[in-house]
């Protein structure tokens, strides 16, 4: 998958590279997410990270695709903003330290195989503190029976999966989503979470 993303970012315009995402913009504009120390988990070419920097956030962006980080740094320079872009693996972080007030994941966790999602959580939790907010977007819909036989088709979140994985650590609010099998993707969901009590790893 890493080679796929590097080739896509280096030679093409990724179809998901569509600028700052609507839910993020709305949360910032309405003040639900306030300028703070933020990290974009799987930042791609940096659209969301750059938007946050333009709105007063102290931003770190992380992606394991070197080609994406190269483009992100160039775009931040063109936008005349400062973002700390880092090449790192979200299932085995080595170059990110400290905690963040706001964490953002648009389409990374749902792109991980099922066996990679627990390592993601173990690496993400130490980046939070009590009160940290986490915005998570991903494909979410009940898999149809035949999809279980399609290779690499364990991508979508299953209903209840986010609550099961994150509920012990976060208060969870589902702020957007739909399921419609006549469209692609058949379903998606956006969650805004707040880290509970005293943060524990």
Report residues per predicted region.
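Class I (Rossmann-like) S-adenosyl-L-methionine-dependent methyltransferase catalytic domain
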Residues: 1-39, 45-95, 112-123, 127, ...
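A short acidic, Gly/Pro-enriched loop at the edge of an enzyme's catalytic core
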Residues: 95-103
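Short catalytic micro-motifs in class I SAM-dependent methyltransferases
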Residues: 107-111
